[in-house]
């Protein structure tokens, strides 16, 4: 983007437990490119995560900044905890303590800003999705269903502190992710799920 062209564009990346999707949006929120998707690679080190997102960005038009949604608890672009990326082979597999140590406290915003060379915002994935659908009036709760359950709360259009409910227990030994996530949808089938 040249100095004479005030157009801004956003590299929008949705990082899920099963896939990582990206596209570029103009300042009105309209897609400027067809979305691209890759399966989430496991085991997913922070280094492989950054490489995967950079590789995806190279398949899309250049953007002036990026917004990245990650599963889990994210504070100021830093990963507090993530449920899927700390597992050996993805959701519902064994947790790797070395990955937990690597991800917890990982400054994703700074790492992505340095790798992409543009300003980056990193939020919880449900918060990013919610920002695109809320009316901006009153108290709004956004729930997303994907690999697991995502949750975002907005008050008067402002994002409230994140409440991570995906790993909360529903029944003895069952989290919300396990109870109503993608694995359960596949088990029940679309006709029962709807």
Predicted regions and their residues:
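Fold-independent oxyanion-binding glycine-rich loops
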Residues: 15-16, 70-71, 124-126, 145-147
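Glycine-rich phosphate-binding loop and adjoining helix at the ATP-binding site
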Residues: 41, 46-54, 58, 65, ...
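Short glycine-aspartate micro-motif
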Residues: 10-14, 65-67, 140-144, 150
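Anionic-ligand binding region
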Residues: 138-141, 148-170
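Short glycine-rich, Thr/Ser-proximal phosphate-binding strand/loop in the N-terminal lobe
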Residues: 2-51, 93-94, 158-186
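Short coil/turn connectors at secondary-structure junctions
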Residues: 6-8, 117-118, 136-140, 147-149
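A short, acidic, amphipathic alpha-helical segment used as a generic capping/interface helix at domain edges
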Residues: 193-194
